Amino acid sequence: MIHASPVRLAAVVVLGGAVALATSACGGPMQAGAAAVVQGQRTTDATVQDQVSSIISLVQKNNLQQGDVTDAQRAALGKAQISLLVEQALWQRAADDEGLEVTSADDAKEQSALVEQDRATLGGKQFTGSDNEAVALADAESQSASGLAPSTVPIYAHVQALIRAVVNEQAAKAHLDPNDQNNVPALQSALQPVLVKAAGEIKVKISPRYGQFDASTAQVVAAQASWIRPTKAQIAAAQQQQDASNGMGTN
């Protein structure tokens, strides 16, 4: 079954509100064909459609979806692709403000841990897809799924590394153990001003097709109807790409 919800690091439950602040403050016309422009980086509608297609293809190939994918599921998956970009910008800015550097080695360590964990989760199925597909499929199977496409797993790993760095920095300043669940409220209090500051500094424009800011809930809510309908050709292309990667081994 296809799900889509926030990042895995459970201690950071303030993320949704901070992202909402970031998206609500940015207006102006969208560039033609753009799904979002985050920190000057343009993501096209076509890119988002391809990402959604790859998720649908992956879950259908592995028999996770009963029946057709609904408009609500498509909308959630499309919004999830944009949310990941906003999360990346937010946590990158927070890390920059704190003077923290997250290296490619940090990203690789995070991604390696994800792959090891998720391949173990899929082990009973003898999953033979790529490492990125393994992470995306395990995500799709979980009840706390974030709508990962295989192609966005490296971005997701980078976000996790950024979150870990910022959380650990704030925990050290407050003399708290970040792994102790009893410290979650205090960590939330420490993180809130850092994220609010970062949210006010990043530049985000999101096409209303993917949702809007709901001031009453401080959340970015998806559009009621989904216009994201990957064509049969797009889904077939995603399937062919996955089959080709399976034949080449993991990566």
PLM regions: where:
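Short, low-structural-confidence N-terminal segments
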Residues: M1-Q73, S189-N251
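N-terminal targeting/tethering segments
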Residues: P29-S142
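A broadly tuned, weak detector of single residues within folded domains
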Residues: V19, G33, Q88, P154-I155, ...
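Short, mixed-charge aromatic SLiMs
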Residues: D106-G123, Q181-I206
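Well-structured core secondary-structure elements of compact alpha/beta domains
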Residues: D50-L77, T152-P185
